[in-house]
C-alpha cells in the first residue's frame, strides 16, 4: 500500500520541526511554553479557565435536544439490575467474591460480598459490609472504594479497605473487621497517599507509602519499604529497603500457592526493568531470579504446591536453558529461596504459537491443584487448564465453553484466594450480553447470571478483517455493524489504545466509553476496534514492535485500518471518528494532527499530549520505558515527530477535537488536555474542552458522572459525523 500524501507531508514537516525546535521543546520548554500555568492543577487562573471552557462545551453539547434522552439511556444501562460488573472491579478472598454495588440510592456504592456460586442469586445473596455513602457523609469526604485494592489478612478475619478521595490513585487504608462489619478502632490506618501494602502476619504489614515528598520517585510512587507493627505509627516503622528516586516504584507483594505464602518485594527501575527481592528485618535485600511483569506489584504471584506460575515478558535464560517470551513457566520457590538454582528450577507450562498470546491483565487463577488461564487466538479467547502430572510435568488441556459462548472474550476473576474451590469466568463480545459462570476445581462451568441488554443488538453482527502493513505485519480489526448494511455511508466510530502490551478485546462495554458503541449502533453508526502493534494481542513481540523510537508504527497501523475501511467501501474519509482514553487519548491527538484527511471527529480522554514534558508531570516518568526519554536527544526526536501538542500548525486543517479530563486525575496530568485545547483555540482551530472536578483517571466514579460524560461524547459524534455538518466546522 502506498503511503498517503498527508502522511508524507506530516513526516517531512515533523522532521523539520524536530531539527529547528528541539531546544524549544525540551531544553527550554519551561520558558517557551505559554501555557505552563495550565499545569497548576488547583491554580485559580487554571481552574477559572477550565470552568469557562467546560461551561462553553456543556452549553453546546448538553443543550442539544438529544442530550437528555442519551443521558437517560446511558444511566439506564449503567443502573440496569441485570448489568454485570467489570471483572476488574471485583476481588475474591476467603471463599467470597467482593464488589462495589452502585445505584440510584447508593451512588458511591455498597461494599458487599457473596459466594461465587451465589453471584447471580439476587440482592438477598449479597452481604453488605460498608455503606460508602454513609461513611463519606459522616466524615465529610468524597470517599470511593476500589475493591481490587482491598488486602485481606492471612486468617481472613480482617481487611485493609482503600478509601479514594474523588477517584484519585492516592488512598487511605483502614483496617476492617469482616465478622463484626466495622472498622477496627485503633487498627491499621494510613494517611491519604500513594501506597502498596501486603500482610506479613495478623499484626504486621509490609508497606511502601509516600509520607513525605522525598519518599516518592519522580513518577510519584513510593520508593521506601517499611515493616509496620500493630500499635505503632507508620512513620516510625522500620525501613527495610529503599530505591533511588529516578526509579519507578518499590512495592511489597505476596507469592503464594495452595500450600505456602511468602512476602517479597518488587523493585521497578522501569515498567520493564524489574527485580524481585527478599527483604527482612536486619538483613540486606536478596535478589531472586524470578522473571515477573509489572502487574506483580498489584496482583502478586500465585502457584501450586512449591511452584509459582510466571508469565514471561522477555526470553529467560536459566543456566543455559532458555524459556521464550510470552510463555508461562513454573518456578520452584523453595529452591529459589534456598539459592539452589539451575535450569531444572524452572519448567515450561505453556508456550503460545504464533497466533496466540496470554493477555497481560489476566494472570493464571489457581483452584486447588489446577491453574486456569485465558489464551487469545487471533484475539479470540480460549480457556486452558494446567495440572501437574505424576511425573511432575505440566499438562495443559482445553476447557470447553458452553455453546453460544465462543467467538468473544473470556475474563477470569483474578483470585487472591489460593484455597478457593471455585471462581468466576465472564464471557462477552460486542453484541452478546455478558454471561457469568462459576468455574469449579474440576473445570466445570455453571451459569450463575446473564446480563440484560438495554439495547436490542440482534440486528447487528461482528466481522474480523486483517490488513497487511508495508513492513509485512498482519494487523486485525473488528468491525460491528447492522446486518446487510455494509456500505460507505454509515458513520464509523473507531476506538483504540496501542501501548503497554494491553490487548483490545471484544467487549460488551468498552474501556473509558462503556456501552457507547451500543448506543452508536442503535443510532445508525458502525464500530471498529483495531488490534494494532503496541498492544498485547500477539504477545511481547507485538508490544515491543512499537515502543520507543518505533512508536510511529502505532499511528500508521490505525491510519492503515481507516484506509482499509475506505478501500473496502465500508466508510469514507471524514466520516470516521476516533475515541481513546489515556494512551488512547494520545492516539486521538496524533491521528487528528497527522491524518486529518481521514478523521472527521476526535475524542481525547484523560490524554497524554505534550510528549516533551510528559515525564515531568505526575506519573509520567514511569512511562519512559514505553515512549522514550525527552531529555535524551536521540529519544526526543521520534517523540517530537508525533507529539500532538508540538505539532499543531496555524494553517492545519484539523477536525474539531473534544478533549475531556478530570481535575482529580493524579496519574495523567490534566494539563495535557488543558494545554492542547488552549493551543488549538489560540491558533484559530475549533476545539471543545471539558474537565470534571472528580473522577480520577476514569473521569467519573458514579453512574451519573459516567452517563453525563457518555452523553456529551455521543452528542459530539452525532453532530460531527451524522448531522450533515462539515466535520471541520463547529456545530451551531
What residue ranges belong to the model's regions?
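Structural motif
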Residues: 105-112, 168-174, 215-226, 270-277, ...
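A conserved hydrophobic secondary-structure block that centers on an alpha-helix together
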Residues: 129-197, 202
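Blade-edge beta-strand/turn elements of extracellular beta-propeller
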Residues: 126, 178-190, 232-244, 282-290, ...
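Non-catalytic accessory segments flanking enzyme active sites
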Residues: 48-151, 162, 249-268, 273-279, ...
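Polar, glycine-rich mid-to-C-terminal structural blocks
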Residues: 223, 227-267
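Short loop/turn segments that connect beta-strands within beta-propeller blades
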Residues: 117, 177-181, 229-233, 280-283, ...
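N-terminal signal peptide c-region/cleavage motif recognized by signal peptidases
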Residues: 23-28
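Serine-hydrolase catalytic core recognition
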Residues: 87-89, 409-732
